[in-house]
Curated annotation (Swiss-Prot):
Record-linked InterPro entries: Mntp/YtaF (IPR003810), Put_MntP (IPR022929)
Residues in the signal sequence: none
PANTHER family: MANGANESE EFFLUX PUMP MNTP-RELATED
Organism expressing this protein natively: Methanoculleus marisnigri (strain ATCC 35101 / DSM 1498 / JR1)
One GO cellular component, as annotated: plasma membrane
Top-level taxon: Archaea
Keyword vocabulary terms for this entry: Cell membrane, Ion transport, Manganese, Membrane, Transmembrane, Transmembrane helix, Transport
Gene name in the database record: mntP
Family: Belongs to the MntP (TC 9.B.29) family.
Keyword Cytoplasm: no
Protein name: Putative manganese efflux pump MntP
A GO molecular-function descriptor: manganese ion transmembrane transporter activity
Segments traversing the membrane: 3-23, 36-56, 60-80, 104-124, 130-150, 165-185
Length: 185
């Protein structure tokens, strides 16, 4: 998988964490930089680790999937992206108060990284190495989450839902690209 595609996947996956970080950052009045680093580390760490777990689990499935891999990758990415878009349109909770502590952030990091687990399965099915994508996803998510906390503390809830919609569109688009490449190239 090329670097541009990997970066787009990373950005798409980071949008949930970005939206949560904006929302949480909007509640902060003190220690903004501290919370930005904590949120970035937790969200980035889980977003990097989950694709590896998905990839390890998906490697066992890859031999059974064969030529259906691109279809599975498309379906997973389209479902994940569609879910992100639907939740953003409905306004389902991405709201959190960081003042409740790091435990809340840990739970949110796990919850927002479940999508990355499914992406890891897609990488395995496509027989794609996982190290570079996992590192890229983690670094991008760290940066987006830290920036989200700082933006949220400065601008409030203006961007939260829009970020999830953009992330969902990116993931659906990547899934469609994988499928079209399989069908026509």
């Amino acid at each position: 998988m090329d670097l541009v595609t990997t970066l787009l996947i990373a950005v798409g996956l980071a949008m949930d964490a970005f939206a949560v970080s904006i929302s949480g950052g909007a509640t902060l009045r003190e220690e903004r930089l501290r919370w930005a680093v904590i949120a970035g580390a937790l969200f980035g760490g889980f977003q990097a680790g989950m694709p590896v777990l998905g990839w390890l689990g998906g490697m066992g499935l890859a031999s059974f999937v064969g030529t259906y891999g691109p279809w599975i990758a498309f379906l997973l990415l389209a479902l994940i992206g569609g879910k992100m878009i639907a939740e953003a349109v409905r306004g389902d909770g991405e709201s959190v108060r960081f003042e409740n502590g790091a435990t809340v952030l840990l739970l949110l990091a796990v919850a927002t990284s479940i999508d990355a687990l499914a992406v890891g399965v897609s990488f395995a099915v496509l027989d794609t190495a996982i190290a570079l994508p996992a590192i890229t996803i983690g670094v991008v998510t760290f940066a987006f989450s830290a920036a989200g906390v700082l933006l949220g503390s400065a601008f409030g809830h203006i961007m939260g839902r829009k970020a999830c919609i953009v992330g969902g569109i990116i993931l659906v688009g990547i899934g469609l690209r994988i499928l079209l490449e399989h069908l026509f190239f």
